[in-house]
Amino acid sequence: MIETSWKHDYITTNGIKLHYVTQGEGALMLMLHGFPEFWYSWRHQISEFAKYFKVVAVDLRGYNDSEKPQEKSAYVMDEFMKDIQGLIKGLEYEKCILVGHDWGGAIAWCFAYAHPEMVERLIILNIPHPAKFSEGLRTPGQLLKSSYMFLFQLPWLPELLMQSLDYQLLENAFKGMAVNKNAFSQADIEAYKNAAAKRGALTAMLNYYRNIFQDKMFNKSWGILEVPTLMIWGEKDTALGKELTYGTEAYVRDLQIKYIPDCSHWVQQEQPELVNQYIQDYLGL
């Protein structure tokens, strides 16, 4: 699913060239994807919200057509946040509506804390508040669900596993986890495989995880976030339990949560109409 009205462009920020897709005019809505995705995970949202905003769906550093630094140290939260800050300013905006899923959501949480003046509204899809995730990792149930993160700490083996049998693990991640198996066409799966197969991409993508336990998300205390926030959560997420959302209101002053039953981690791809409706309602569109 590629719209001819989508424009592909690049911007250099924080010493790195980032690729993004954009459509629309007006205030900035910035979309941050997760693992193992790229800008394409927002294919059902870009045109819908381009009716109201300048939508920018970026490839995070290391992904798809964005630059892929080789050093593991390049994949830490401080660098991700500098990328986003520079992207917003480079697009000549002072602030944005920030939308993030999975890893993109983790970056969005941290960015909203670090730069609340640059985030008008925060919209988070299937990633818990960092404090809640840290709490969750102390429980046996979530530790088991997150066991893949420990596998990803190993050198080279995760890359070999991901590449084997024509990226079968990647296909299984989407189609196997999805409640609605029709949410991903074979063309969608091929798009994700092609992005992961780009030179240096797999190691870059995995390096996000290889730094995670030394990074800021798990090694700080979190205050009250003043940015108005919407969380949307697919309840059948096999990697992140719904219980990780409980108590988020202790960390976010103005919070709404919308749960979607019978929906997996890939919430905006599996239930795009409902996700779009919840975002539109939240923004008063």
Language-model features: locations:
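A short, glycine- and basic residue-enriched loop/turn
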Residues: 38-39, 106, 263-264
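Catalytic histidine-centered segment of alpha/beta-hydrolase-like enzymes
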Residues: 263-272, 276
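Flexible "cap/lid" subdomain of the alpha/beta-hydrolase fold that forms the substrate-access gate
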Residues: 1-9, 16-18, 56, 63-99, ...
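Well-ordered beta-strand positions
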Residues: 12, 21-22
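Short phosphate-engaging motifs
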Residues: 28, 38, 169, 201, ...
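A generic "binding-loop/recognition-motif" signal
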Residues: 16, 26, 263
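Conserved HGGG/HGGXW glycine-rich cap/lid loop of the alpha/beta-hydrolase fold
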Residues: 22-67
